[in-house]
Amino acid sequence: MALAPAAGQRRQDMAQDSEIARGDGTARSARTFTGAGQRGTRPGRLWGWIESRTGIRALAYAVPEHANTIWYILGGITFMAILISVASGVWIAQYYNPDPAAARESVLFIQNEALLGDVMRGIHIWSAYIAVIGAVLHMVRVFITASYKAPREVNWLVGVGLLGLIMFGAFFTGTVLRWDQEAYEAMVHNMELASLLGAFGGFFSDAFTTSVSMLPRLYIAHVSIVPLLLVFLLIAHIFLIKYHGISPTPAQEEAGEAPGGKLPKERQTASYATHARKMLGYGLVVLGLAGTLAVLLPGAIGAAPDPAMEITKPSPIYYWMYTPEAWFGVNGVLYAAIVFFGLLVLVPFLDRTPLRRLRRRPLMLGLGGVLVVALTVLTIITAVTPVVSHLE
Ligand code: HEM
């Protein structure tokens, strides 16, 4: 008996909190989010119970209107693609064997015999592509709206780390696990690059230990080290987004409406609940898209690796590095990565004016343009040229 009024009071307090957070006192979206409109009905009572026990209403905090447009949900869509990739990865890991003598056979087992193996493997591969493409599009949005400017420079750097991690940690190690010809060549590249890095590359080289071969070590990286780092960086990214709030639009900032790079409370008239709902909706679209692609374009499994040959190109995601490799040898991969990621790291420190519209930031307009043209041209050259032998 004594607990009931306390829970009711807590609910009332939380409702007031979300009204205060909205600044305009209407709490319209908070009510929609919590389903309070249907109080008295069975689903309404169930939802009320969930709210009071979990505090989910706290998600209905105020955000600027533009935060709920697709451009500002691209990061959330990338997040959903990562979640789908993790869930499908857990499924196929039940059937994968990282022993080099059995790895490729186990991938064939996943594709042809395991329960839902082909669909889950396809969803895993395609959601990984969607995550990389989503992260790049999200970064382009942040770049165009100059959201990396003070006070969000550190979050831009965390983002660069996330991009590197999903492209070279998750995606790359995943490619090697297939243990066909392309996978094997990717791993040999990994080892040659490690030797170029000297002491820094030790961990990624074959010589690090004689007790476990490279494939099981890359598997451990793929299923534990990389996901742990990803969780750590995502927590930092999300903390900083919450701490600084979503950046104002370039027009709002240049009109002086956002002192300190943040819209005042009374201008934040939308709800994060809407953002979260849209994110879940787009997440279902990503799942549907990955599932459809899994059926229409199942992930290929090449011939068993032959160490004497070099016959494949990497995944299209790395095409921009393959052409520099043809020009400079394996060093070319390193040069391409250093130039690309080095420029990304420099962005917030090169562009320090308060101007936010892209057309008023000629240096960034030029840098962005040069990068897009260079990446496109390098990718096209790789696509139209025959395979070249790069390895010693
Ligand atoms: C794994 C990849 C990533 C995930 C899951 C992710 C997630 C998010 C989410 C959910 C937001 C909130 C708003 C939005 O969606 O735009 C955001 C904001 C932000 N992200 Fe990312 N992000 C990723 C990669 C990146 C990259 C590659 C960069 C840049 C190099 C970056 C820089 C930023 C910045 C500066 C903000 C604040 C933007 C603002 O306040 O307008 N993120 N991110």
Predicted regions and their residues:
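Membrane-embedded alpha-helical bundles that constitute the cytochrome b-like, heme-associated redox core
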Residues: A2-W327, G332-E392
